[in-house]
């Protein structure tokens, strides 16, 4: 039995990656010092592999993003960045003023930089995999370089602002891209490399027959090289074509789907290739039931095993988690522990006496009263009492808002003072009373500022919240937060996903104190601010033995209890943030109807409010076209969307959807940029929207929360936004 593993987190046990990268950006360390620290992290990653697996991967530590590294390797550098000058160009592409677009990697919480293919004149600019291979070779360590495959690279790229997905377009680009990959492989083999690991996760997407013909042509060009292909996140879309590729070995993910196993049983597996069975879950942090896993490996007759997908979706180790609920830590396996599980499986198949644990979750942290509530749900639980048109009439009478009402998305700048006070409170250096008094002062200040600016619907600023998911996770039963469970989101940004380990329920009000205090300071409506069930679930780890639908409904019930408390306290507008609604959708569109059915139900269960309560939904996407029909089924009254980057073009999704009647908060200010938008810039976006939607449906707001901006940017931008609304009212009030 041979053990492969891949994607070990580069972050470091003490987030050394983040510190070194940010120190380099700030000029605190030189380029050489930065590279030395990265080399130490490389060695740390490889030592973890060497202890547990047979095939040690290299080329796994990117200075920012592995897709960007691939773009550099093949010379896909847009003209605006000029001649490639090493790290200065690299980080300009990653985070400069004209940086590449960033988006989610398949349906995960990792973000990658989208390559821009301009001329299609690829060249081998820098053989990064070879450099890493030779680095380890100089240390006496043999590795198998890991490379993003050519098909996935193009599939994740854009040309002229459009995704490169059409087979004819891909074929043209492959004529120039394939020779570059050949050169990379040739140089590796010439230097004694015995195996090259090629990641092709795009093979699991909705591909046509023409795509697979193209894939076969591409890989026939590589038939002499020792390639092993890795696929993950779902089943390969054409099993028979996949297993016929002329390569040394093929990895299949047997965790995320059932189709790979069904296809294996139906079509078998070629005897001239190595089957690498991805049987240890790389996305969820639970210890595997190794007895069951061993039975599956036996059934497959696999001669090699691995994790199902990259381990960078997990924290490094559960070893230092000392404040988790009783009985939880021993059920956890982070990246290091996953490698150990693979080693135990290998020893078992080699006939060594090892214990294959059977982890049981059956009765762990279960609350039957919540299960009972879910069983009692009826179709009316997922529908509001009155239809939208009737709710709209009631709400307009109740709220008496002007035309083009203005608001923000929720958070305001979290200054270093706010972060310091929160840290002091968590360390026990100040009392709860002192901390709450400080938060009240911040709320009072932000309400005053919003009133002075002239916003119509106010927010409390979210100064008490570190993170929109972690805040609720800390207040709900059945969800744990970690001390050191850091995962990389993009660049140097890390977050700690909460762990949904039991039945989720609410212990008491979570947001009431701060929101009702803010409302007491003003006559204007203050929005209640909640995170939706799909986002809490999608940005957390959760149990594998409980259906996703049930977990989502548990969270939705808890959020709905909060909505009802806010209503009782006189709050007339409640916003439910659901940025994960689209991104949690399965990779394959054939699985969308089932997912969206329960995702829509979960939102509607959470949002089941009185007719006079105006429910806002916030979703920060730039592409609604694919999911507009599903969004239309959500029971909100107003949806706020990003519109600034697309200059209002996002609204075409609503133009193409006949029968749209709900209100839309148009994000006219791109908060990801430090620039203060002018009234005219923002007006052009609203005018684009007014070509399609009636003026009565339009709100004016930033496209996202303002937590990461500073006050010097926020105040003038919001003033311009309010001036815009006043200008629009003058212009359109009598039309």
From Swiss-Prot:
Catalytic activity: 5-methyltetrahydropteroyltri-L-glutamate + L-homocysteine = tetrahydropteroyltri-L-glutamate + L-methionine
Pathway(s) it belongs to: Amino-acid biosynthesis; L-methionine biosynthesis via de novo pathway; L-methionine from L-homocysteine (MetE route): step 1/1
Keyword set, alphabetical order: Amino-acid biosynthesis, Metal-binding, Methionine biosynthesis, Methyltransferase, Repeat, Transferase, Zinc
A Gene Ontology biological process term: methylation
Pfam families, alphabetized: Meth_synt_1 (PF08267), Meth_synt_2 (PF01717)
Database matches in CDD domains: CIMS_C_terminal_like (cd03311), CIMS_N_terminal_like (cd03312)
Enzyme Commission designation: 2.1.1.14
An annotated Gene Ontology molecular function: 5-methyltetrahydropteroyltriglutamate-homocysteine S-methyltransferase activity
Binding site for L-homocysteine: 409-411, 462, 577
Residue numbers binding 5-methyltetrahydropteroyltri-L-glutamate: 15-18, 104, 493-494, 539, 583
InterPro entries: Cbl-indep_Met_Synth_N, Cobalamin-indep_Met_synthase, Met_Synth_C/arc, UROD/MetE-like_sf
Positions annotated to bind Zn(2+): 618, 620, 642, 704
Enzyme active site: 672
Residues that coordinate or bind L-methionine: 409-411, 462, 577
Top class in the EC scheme: transferase
Cofactors: Zn(2+)
Note describing how the cofactor binds: Binds 1 zinc ion per subunit.
Xref: HAMAP family: Meth_synth
Function text: Catalyzes the transfer of a methyl group from 5-methyltetrahydrofolate to homocysteine resulting in methionine formation.
UniProt family annotation: Belongs to the vitamin-B12 independent methionine synthase family.
Name this polypeptide is given: 5-methyltetrahydropteroyltriglutamate--homocysteine methyltransferase
Organism in which the protein naturally occurs: Thermotoga petrophila (strain ATCC BAA-488 / DSM 13995 / JCM 10881 / RKU-1)
Record lineage: Bacteria, Thermotogati, Thermotogota, Thermotogae, Thermotogales
């Amino acid at each position: 039995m041979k053990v492969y593993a891949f994607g070990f987190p580069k972050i470091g046990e003490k987030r050394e990656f983040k510190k070194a990268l940010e120190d380099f950006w700030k000029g605190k360390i030189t380029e050489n010092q930065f590279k030395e620290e990265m080399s130490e992290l490389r060695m740390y990653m490889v030592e973890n592999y060497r202890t547990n697996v047979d095939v040690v991967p290299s080329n796994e530590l990117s200075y920012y993003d592995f897709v960007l590294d691939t773009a550099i390797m093949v010379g896909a550098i847009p003209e605006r960045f000029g001649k490639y000058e090493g790290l200065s160009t690299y980080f300009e592409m990653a985070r400069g003023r004209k940086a590449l677009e960033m988006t989610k990697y398949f349906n995960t919480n990792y973000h990658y930089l989208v390559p821009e293919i301009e001329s299609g004149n690829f060249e081998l600019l820098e053989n990064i995999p070879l450099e890493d291979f030779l680095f380890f070779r100089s240390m006496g360590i043999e590795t198998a370089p890991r490379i993003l495959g050519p098909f996935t690279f193009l599939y994740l790229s854009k040309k002229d602002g459009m995704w490169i997905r059409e087979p004819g377009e891909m074929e043209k680009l492959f004529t120039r891209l394939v020779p570059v990959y050949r050169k990379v492989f040739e140089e590796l083999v010439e230097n004694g490399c015995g195996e090259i690991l090629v990641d092709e996760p795009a093979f699991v997407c909705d591909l046509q027959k023409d795509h697979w013909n193209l894939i076969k042509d591409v890989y026939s060009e590589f038939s002499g090289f020792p390639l092993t292909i890795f696929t993950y996140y779902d089943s390969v879309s054409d099993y028979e074509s996949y297993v016929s590729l002329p390569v040394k070995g093929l990895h299949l993910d047997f965790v995320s789907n059932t189709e790979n196993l069904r296809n294996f049983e139906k079509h078998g597996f070629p005897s001239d290739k190595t089957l690498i069975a991805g049987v240890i879950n790389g996305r969820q942090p639970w210890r595997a039931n190794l007895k069951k896993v061993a039975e599956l490996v036996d059934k497959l007759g696999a001669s090699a095993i691995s994790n199902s997908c990259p381990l960078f979706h997990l924290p490094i180790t559960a070893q230092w988690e000392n404040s988790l609920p009783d009985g939880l830590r021993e059920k956890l396996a982070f990246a290091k522990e996953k490698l150990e599980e693979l080693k135990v499986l290998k020893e078992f198949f080699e006939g060594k006496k090892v214990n294959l644990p059977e982890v049981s979750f059956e009765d762990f942290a279960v609350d039957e009263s919540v299960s009972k509530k879910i069983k009692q749900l009826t179709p009316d639980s997922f529908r509001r009492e009155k239809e939208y048109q009737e709710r709209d009439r009631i709400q307009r009478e109740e709220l008496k808002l002007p035309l083009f009402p203005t608001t923000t998305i929720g958070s305001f700048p979290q200054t270093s003072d706010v972060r310091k006070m929160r840290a002091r409170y968590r360390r026990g250096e100040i009392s709860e009373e002192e901390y709450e008094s400080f938060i009240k002062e911040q709320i009072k200040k932000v309400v005053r500022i919003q009133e002075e600016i002239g916003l119509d619907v106010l927010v409390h600023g979210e100064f008490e919240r570190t993170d929109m998911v972690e805040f609720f996770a800390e207040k709900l039963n059945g969800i744990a937060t970690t001390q050191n469970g850091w995962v990389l989101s993009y660049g140097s940004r890390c977050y700690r996903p909460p762990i949904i380990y039991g039945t989720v329920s609410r212990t008491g009000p979570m947001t009431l104190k701060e929101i009702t205090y803010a409302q007491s300071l003003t006559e204007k409506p203050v929005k209640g601010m909640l995170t939706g069930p799909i986002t809490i679930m999608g940005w957390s780890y959760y149990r594998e033995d409980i259906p996703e639908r049930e977990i989502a409904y548990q969270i939705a019930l808890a959020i709905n209890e909060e909505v009802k408390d806010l209503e009782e306290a006189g709050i007339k507008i409640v916003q439910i943030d659901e940025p994960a609604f689209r991104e949690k959708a399965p990779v394959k569109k054939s699985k969308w109807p089932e997912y969206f059915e329960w995702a829509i139900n979960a939102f509607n269960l959470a949002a089941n409010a009185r007719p006079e309560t105006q429910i806002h939904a916030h979703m920060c996407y730039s592409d609604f076209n694919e999911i507009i029909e599903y969004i239309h089924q959500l029971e909100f009254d107003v949806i706020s969307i990003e519109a600034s980057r697309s200059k209002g073009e996002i609204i075409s999704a609503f133009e193409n959807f006949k029968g749209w009647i709900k209100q839309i908060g148009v994000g006219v200010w791109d908060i990801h940029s430090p620039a203060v938008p002018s009234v005219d810039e923002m007006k052009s976006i609203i005018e684009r929207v007014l070509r399609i939607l009636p003026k009565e449906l339009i709100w004016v707001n930033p496209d996202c929360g303002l937590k990461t901006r500073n006050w010097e940017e926020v105040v003038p931008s919001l003033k311009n936004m309010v001036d815009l609304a006043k200008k629009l009212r003058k212009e359109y009030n009598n039309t």
